[in-house]
Amino acid sequence: MTTSSHHNKGDNSADLYLASQSPRRRELLAQIGVKVAVLSVDVAEQREVGESPAQYVQRLAYDKAMAGAKLAATQPRSLPCLGSDTIVVIENRVLEKPRDEEDGVAMLLALSGQTHQVMTAVAVATEAKQLMRLSVTDVTFREISRAEAIEYWRTGEPADKAGGYGIQGLGAVFVRELKGSYTAVVGLPLFETKTLLDAFEVPVWQNLAP
């Protein structure tokens, strides 16, 4: 594992470090009033032999949060760090970001007409304290043709998304039913996240000073 740091402008006003380059996670935290500074961490994303999908995604979130917490300890301001990871799971098979068009199309066709699980783990850590939550959401897709899957890939939207689709974008048209947390499918379960932030006394919109 290697780590490096990168900061958003306005770090002095941040209340939380975010160990993620995901614009969706930044947007979701901003949605609930959390000001973040980004730390860039590089954590190997390789599922270990015998590791369940739930164990895998939680380990990645924890490792990212801890890598960020170690970097945070070297920064001028000592703040908790949030790490998160999202995977799509169908029949115990983990679908992460597609490698290329062939992989992306194959993912969509595997999900076509089926119910899959989106697992998002979120961890908040300092070097002294670590807490984590896991959100599991059932998502059911309608039938998708190969031609439609190819057309969707060529929009560019699915390339950087677990499972090869974005529920908050064009990919919403594939979703017939969702049971669980919509924001977890986007990238960060806000209910669970707020619970963690409260434990670290990170302000959200309900307790921001006027």
From Swiss-Prot:
Active-site residues annotated for this sequence: 85 (proton acceptor)
Enzyme class per UniProt: hydrolase
EC number: 3.6.1.9
Positions in coiled-coil regions: none
Free-text function comment from the UniProt entry: Nucleoside triphosphate pyrophosphatase that hydrolyzes dTTP and UTP. May have a dual role in cell division arrest and in preventing the incorporation of modified nucleotides into cellular nucleic acids.
Domain of life: Bacteria
UniProt keyword Acetylation present: no
Record has Metal-binding as a keyword: no
Organism (species): Saccharophagus degradans (strain 2-40 / ATCC 43961 / DSM 17024)
InterPro entries for the chain: ITPase-like_fam, Maf-like
Broad class of where this protein is predominantly found: cytoplasm
Family membership noted in the UniProt record: Belongs to the Maf family. YhdE subfamily.
Cellular component terms (Gene Ontology): cytoplasm
Protein's recorded name: dTTP/UTP pyrophosphatase
Protein location: Cytoplasm
UniProtKB keywords: Cytoplasm, Hydrolase, Nucleotide metabolism
Gene3D superfamilies on file: 3.90.950.10
Entry GO MF terms: dTTP diphosphatase activity; UTP diphosphatase activity
Reaction catalyzed: dTTP + H2O = dTMP + diphosphate + H(+); UTP + H2O = UMP + diphosphate + H(+)
GO BP, one annotated term: nucleotide metabolic process
